[in-house]
Regions:
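Structural alpha/beta surface segment adjacent to cysteine/selenocysteine redox centers
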Residues: 1-62, 132, 136-137, 141
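C-terminal cap of thioredoxin/glutaredoxin-like
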Residues: 58-141
Length: 141
């Protein structure tokens, strides 16, 4: 219906040693290989999170069709790191301290308002919160 937008933000937690490298790599795979490559990379990172290393992250990106030299350049680019840092700052403003976390509500520019949902939830729980947010948005028009 076009009424819902799903936005992924990075929140590499400091106690996960490879989290920042994984976030950088996933963001670079999206930039270099597109949306489908990003989702394949994200899935591979989650499936392998217990054994992530710089070498494995590079191999997984290669499996998504990303050239290792281009990946390394992207991951070393200050702009890539700044975008992840901005996501971390936004999470802090929203009170998000862990993953997975979701904000279901409305966004106007850089301002997001809504309900914070922390942790894995059932499809029913998400559906109810999304329907609630859609009703509130409709009523405020």
């Amino acid at each position: 219906s076009g009424k819902v937008r799903y936005v992924v933000k990075d929140l590499p937690l400091p106690f996960h040693g490879q989290a920042r490298g994984a976030a950088l790599a996933a963001r670079c795979v999206a930039e270099l290989g597109g949306r489908e490559a990003y989702w394949r990379m994200a899935d591979a990172l989650f499936l392998n999170q217990a054994k992530l290393s710089a070498e494995l992250i590079e191999r997984l990106a290669g499996e998504q069709g990303v050239d290792p030299a281009r990946l390394a350049a992207c991951m070393a680019d200050k702009k890539t790191a700044e975008r992840i840092d901005a996501d971390v700052q936004e999470a802090g403003r929203l009170g998000i301290t862990g993953t997975p976390s979701f904000v279901i509500g409305t966004a106007k520019g850089d301002i997001v308002t809504g309900t914070l949902v922390v942790g894995a939830q059932s499809e029913t729980a998400f559906s109810a919160r999304i329907e609630d947010a859609l009703k509130k948005a409709e009523a405020s028009r």
